[in-house]
Amino acid sequence: MGQRTSQATLQSSTHFTSNSDILKSFNDRALKQFTVTELVSFKNKLGKDLNERLTNEELTKWLSVPQDEILLRELLYNFVQVLGNFPLMKNSYENVTGIGVLKAIILTNPERCKKYVKSRNYDQLKLWFIALSIRKTVKEDPNLSSSSSSEESFDVTRILKTFDGLHVNELSVPFAYMVPFISWLLILTTYCPINNCKLENVAMFDNWNSYIKSAHTILRSMRPMDESSWIEYEPFAHTMRSIAPHIFDPLTRVMEHLLFKDDELVDPLSENRGEIASSKLLNSALLAQISSALSKQLPIYHLQRLYLGRDHGFSMRSFQAKVFKWSAPTIMLLRGKRILDDEEYSVKNTRFRKFLHEYPKLKPSDMDTEVEEMYPAKSKIILAVYVSDPWKITNKEFFGGPHTTIVQLSPFQEVFGSSRENALYFNTIGGGIGIGNKQPVIKSTAKSYSPGNVSLTMDSALEFAVLRHAGQGGVLKPGLVVGDKDFEVKMLLQDVEVWGCGGEKELEEQLKQWEWEESEAKRRQQINLRSIGEDRALLEMAGLVGQAQSGGSV
């Protein structure tokens, strides 16, 4: 791959006389973060001098942004522009250039970023929010100081620590801009699982509206008042860290893919992986949304259809016949229509009336009206339950590993993780399916469910389900968005599906395959330094060749 040169140390005692000096120092330092092959491949893709201006059209084409998504193109161009002017994000706005894009590649990659800023605790998420929120079209004089004290102004340590004196709590991103941005990240989750991914798949944006829908779901977790509102930092950071911690992973990959020549890119969908799983309920957007919460636990390209209630019948017997032979993790998907008025619906449906009698109701006084508003009357409730262990009949016992997780996918995204093992039961003597519950009490003449504080209960006919959230102390942890709020949502199930995930062996093989493909691409990047021609000046500027440098083993 080629050895990396030692990084130029930027001590806090280094004296800078202007913002231009600071920018030049960080630009030079950025070049030293890359190998010879990476720089040459990038220069080949760039097709121009590193200091020449890049247009919006050029940059967004490389990043596979739909041409008709004007807001997204504007947002991403500004995003890269801000990162390209790091660390002076407030006072100096140069054009987007090749050097700026290289800095953006570094700053969107957690490992590269830590080395670049020389801090393992640097808050990258805050940096990204700043880059998303700042809009600046007029370039200021880079030699102007950011305060009245020039000595304080040119203190790089302070600039890094304070994000150039920006107050992030005073910044915000328009909801209208954030929707296509999150949608784009979700699409990349599907189509860019590796760094050297080829993004010329014409079908990528066929289901754009589905990804928009999933993006809305994630953004609702930030509790915006309406679609004309603005997203502020605190709800943004809390949501991304808690219920969508992997949403930015594909951003790292799509930026890294700029370091590969076009003939070194591969299409993951064409590499003998088959089509992405789909059904009446499941689609690629929903899978990407689940991946934002579960990441590597969900192998998008290896899901197997095991049970679909619509096709196989809504019964425990059909469920058992189709699912129990699968010896690896599974995802159970539920979609239901919320039952708004228990009493009114029980008059129409005698089976629901019987279920109400068996299920202990949460006291109305305990219900949080604010959370109730988060489940609109006509909204569909979609849940994904990740089950790491094989399913089995447990009429008295329980099963399930410590990674059992419920991910709510609609009407807003939420995560209910497991606090310990054995969170599930599959009761074939009338108890149905429970996650986070005690076993139901079943007698010849009566039945009584025992829901946990945070739990999901399904009746034995797979007709009704209840999501309860009533505090700490149970097998499942409270939601990370709703927190300590108490509520209960009853639903009429319309879809129940179970999809088989690849086991550890399959996941390991997939990761090894992707790693091999990337290493092969990097091997093909190897160049003969004696014939690099015009690229030699670039490498000398980076300190990788010339001046007694060997250029590394390439």
From Swiss-Prot:
Keyword Cytoplasm listed: yes
Pfam families cross-referenced by the UniProt entry: TLD (PF07534)
Subcellular location per the Swiss-Prot or TrEMBL entry: Cytoplasm
Matching PROSITE patterns: TLDC
Biological process, per Gene Ontology: response to oxidative stress
Entry keyword set: Cytoplasm
Signal peptide segment: none
Record-linked InterPro entries: TLDc_dom (IPR006571)
Family classification: Belongs to the RTC5 family.
Entries under PANTHER family matching the protein: NUCLEOLAR PROTEIN 7/ESTROGEN RECEPTOR COACTIVATOR-RELATED, RESTRICTION OF TELOMERE CAPPING PROTEIN 5
Protein name per its UniProtKB record: Restriction of telomere capping protein 5
Gene name tied to this protein: RTC5
